[in-house]
Amino acid sequence: MASAKPALLFLIFALISLTILTIFWNASSIQREAVPLVATTVVRGPSLLVFPISNSTGDPAQGIFADSLTEDLIGALIRFRNMRVFGADNTIHTLAASTSRDNERATTAEYVLKGTAGQFDGQLRVTVTLMDGKSRRYIWSNTFQRDFTPATLADVRQKISAEVARKIAQPFGVVYEEEARASADQKTNMLSSYECMLRTYQYWRQLTANLHAQARTCLERAVQVDPLYAEAWAALALVTADEGRLGFNRSSGRPDPIAKSMQLAQYAVALSPDAPLPLRALGMSYWLQGEPHLGIATYERAFSLNPNDSDLLAELGRCYSLIGAWDKGVPLILEAYARNPALSGWYHSILALYHYVHGRFGAALDEAKQINVPESVLPHVSLAMIHAEAGHPAEAAAEVEKIQSIDPQFADNAQASLERLNLAPDTLSRIADGLRKAGLFGRAQREASEQW
């Protein structure tokens, strides 16, 4: 029996390998192109060295709190997969100040994080500073003060750590802005795989067909240069999905972008099963294939891996809201915008829909005007139905003209297009009411829409 175990293990390994290769065969059907030699140097993100948080009180008993804060901070930072986080030796804080400065100067990390912490009169006070690891330039600093009791000390400490991590490491955070600025003038075909991810986040922030094309081209090259970069495969899956979801840059070579997106997402998850972005891509693929509960379960799994991810929080809010769980979904979107105001305006479409189905047309219009995705038909659908219900016929008619300009067949395909959003039945019915009032439908279409 003992001799059978190696054979069994080999068989299991072979089956797993075959599965990954099969997915890769499907995913790797991306058209190949010449890759500049400069792109063969793969950079997966900058490095961040976290120095131990110093005890600012002079009370040795508070050193334990500072050490625990350092550990919490590193733990929160490593949940983001867009930088390499290193912790300096915890004995450094026992060295003389001059020795500490020598250690800082000696680092090769792109960024250095340092700070102080202490407890004063029932308050925690934490000051954190981010510096350029090479030039020693100060990039960002903030002080966090929170009330606490002995019972809430650990919870408050962890919340401060999470807030610092989001400020620094999340998309559109401090490090993202620094890195994006550094590569802003580079041509797409000269970007590293990590820099392609920066461009993709720029697209997710400003959803336009031009940025979509740039992101797709860059990511297709990135996965050739760096085929084990799970996040790049996941980003490519999400960008490919937008060909069908938003109608951006449809390709005759991809007649079914949603199915292609699923293949890419599955491959990304096979490469890195515990990475949030691949799971987010898989969740989106399930959602677009009409399996909303599988999509939500996958998003929940991704969010459990990084509860500090504002994008995942907003995606969960979007999904719960569209299936009719407004009480659960809307607070998640509001929390996501509170955490990261630079999130895409796309999620305002969900808030607009929330107010619309509850008859608050003024509030719905305020939200819809913030969507800012003019090249997609869906924001104009929102504005058309809201204006119609609010008693603005001229504005509703203008939005109908924009819908017809972007997609002349939308009125014919409206039911199928909207059902792909996995809308709750009463929500779909309210949308149909608004679009009829807006004048989108001809007679036959109007009669059909009454059965939605």
Give the predicted meaning of each segment:
Residues 211-228, 256-272, 298-300:
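Amphipathic alpha-helices of TPR/Sel1-like and other helical repeat/solenoid scaffolds
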Residues 201-209, 237-252, 289-290, 324, ...:
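Short coil/turn linking the two alpha-helices of tandem helical-hairpin repeats
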Residues 20-37, 70-214, 218:
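Catalytic-center loop of serine/cysteine hydrolases
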Residues 29-67, 74, 189-190:
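A structural "domain/chain start" motif
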Residues 189-205, 234, 276, 280, ...:
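Alpha-helical tetratricopeptide repeat
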Residues 204-207, 224, 287, 321, ...:
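Hydrophobic/aromatic side-chain positions at a characteristic register within alpha-helices
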Residues 261-266, 275, 280, 294, ...:
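Alpha-helical protein-protein interaction modules
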